[in-house]
Amino acid sequence: MTTRTDAVKAYLLDLQDRICAALETEDGGTRFVEDAWTRPAGGGGRTRVIENGTVIEKGGVNFSHVFGSGLPPSASAHRPELAGRGFEALGVSLVIHPHNPHVPTSHANVRFFIAEKEGEEPVWWFGGGFDLTPYYGNEEDCIHWHRVAEKACAPFGPDVYPRYKAWCDTYFHIKHRHEPRGIGGLFFDDLNEWDFDTSFAFMRAIGDAYIDAYLPIVQRRKNDAFTARQREFQEFRRGRYVEFNLVYDRGTLFGLQSGGRTESILMSLPPQVRWAYDWKAEPGSEEARLTEYFLQDRDWLAQA
């Protein structure tokens, strides 16, 4: 490993530890179980899963560091000059599915790729972001989520938050449903326009911001009363989450195509989901308002 890779790996392992500790404290009912694994083709990771907690129905916080002699198609499709290069990929990826339908599902990911070829300069980039998927929308939560995102981006330039907010809205779009997965956040990939130190600092800022963005929402909503009907709607909307992850998500596709560990890759899927044929929300209901108001391209900071 290079010095750069060592530094990124040390940060990611520490980030995984800090996020797991914060989520365990907030849940208060159970702890993460760690499953350390190795990849026969090179590398390995630490998968940590929490299930049937007081607050969290299922969640996973995964660290992986994999390497190989050639990039899989999902990583080189839009960068054909990288075909045939050896690679290392490091990242932390997490998804939290709470019990309570009033608590949104959250996702975050930060990652580093480096691709090398003998006689040529290494090519590296960072990626990541975080996004929020509510089932029952709440303006206060949406504004808070985006304020934390904007604050994390601010030291790196005034255009960074709006650019990566827009990319998030575009990326987390379920094309066959013609709707977004959630209310967005930040998404960036192939980041190497700054020097390494600045790019790495930005990745750290995004990784560190996740807990500040998510925990206050959990704390506000985790004790809200909910009905069996609201729970059914949560499970119905989780189906959209599954559809996106299995059809479009780059991380899922990269993991499966590169021979990654299937259990770790699919830890993002919720434990209980339902599909109903041609289901429609009642006009004027909270369920209808989710898609009509919250799942729209919206400047949440302008709502404040």
Swiss-Prot record:
Reaction catalysed by this enzyme: coproporphyrinogen III + O2 + 2 H(+) = protoporphyrinogen IX + 2 CO2 + 2 H2O
What GO terms are given for molecular function? coproporphyrinogen oxidase activity; metal ion binding; protein homodimerization activity
List residue numbers at the site (Important for dimerization). H176
> Where are the catalytic residues?
H107
Positions that bind substrate: S93, N109, V110, R111, G259, G260, R261
Q: Where does a divalent metal cation bind?
A: H97, H107, H146, H176
NCBIfam families from the UniProt entry: PRK05330.1
Descriptive protein name: Oxygen-dependent coproporphyrinogen-III oxidase
Q: Per the UniProt entry, what species is this protein from, by scientific name? A: Pseudomonas fluorescens (strain Pf0-1)
The major lineage groups are: Bacteria, Pseudomonadati, Pseudomonadota, Gammaproteobacteria, Pseudomonadales
> Source gene?
hemF
